[in-house]
């Protein structure tokens, strides 16, 4: 999972991580701040779960930096890799959704679940929504569905 530290976003990451580690036994769950995730991490991954915030109708700068640094190093090397995405958007998440879909398409990765957009003022239900998306993704990987 690639995620940037922020108070509520960090809370989501913590709860998702705890749930994944307690509910999956055959997966090696690695969580990295996007500034520290690198090409080797992507090449070793069987799937990628991306959590990002939306800032000014665009994906967080940390997430953009992650793709800028790694895009050309992994293009054509991880075609078909399953991906799931959640976006914490104060407004509507449209800009980040468009960007994420474009990048995923360019890398020829597979978006295996609809992008989850947690929009509007912070709500505790965002945690459960992100857990459900993440757990479904992890179970799909663990079961070789993807």
Each language-model region and where it sits:
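Short, small-residue-biased leader/transition segments that mark boundaries at the very start
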Residues: 1-3
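Short histidine/acidic/glycine/proline-rich micro-motifs that form metal-
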Residues: 6-7, 56, 87-92, 117-123
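Short helix-loop-beta junction
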Residues: 14-26, 105-110
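Alpha-helical elements of Rossmann-like donor-binding domains used by nucleotide-donor carbohydrate transfer enzymes
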Residues: 15, 65, 99, 129-136
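Glycine-rich phosphate/pyrophosphate-binding loop and the adjoining helix
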Residues: 23, 38, 110-146
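A short beta-strand-loop structural module common to alpha/beta enzyme folds
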Residues: 25-36
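Helix-loop-strand module that forms the ligand-binding subsite of alpha/beta enzymes
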Residues: 34-111
């Amino acid at each position: 999972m690639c995620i940037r530290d922020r108070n509520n976003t960090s809370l989501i990451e913590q709860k998702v991580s705890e749930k994944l580690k307690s509910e999956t036994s055959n997966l090696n769950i690695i969580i990295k701040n996007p500034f520290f995730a690198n090409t080797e991490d992507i090449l070793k991954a069987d799937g990628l779960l991306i959590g990002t915030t939306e800032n000014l109708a665009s994906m967080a700068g940390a997430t953009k930096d992650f793709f800028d640094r790694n895009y050309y190093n992994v293009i054509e090397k991880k075609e078909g890799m399953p991906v799931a995405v959640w976006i914490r958007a104060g407004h509507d998440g449209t800009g980040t959704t468009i960007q994420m879909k474009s990048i995923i398409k360019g890398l020829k990765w597979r978006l295996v679940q609809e992008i989850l957009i947690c929009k509007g003022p912070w709500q505790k239900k965002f945690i459960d929504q992100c857990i459900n998306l993440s757990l479904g993704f992890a179970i799909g990987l663990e079961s070789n569905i993807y």
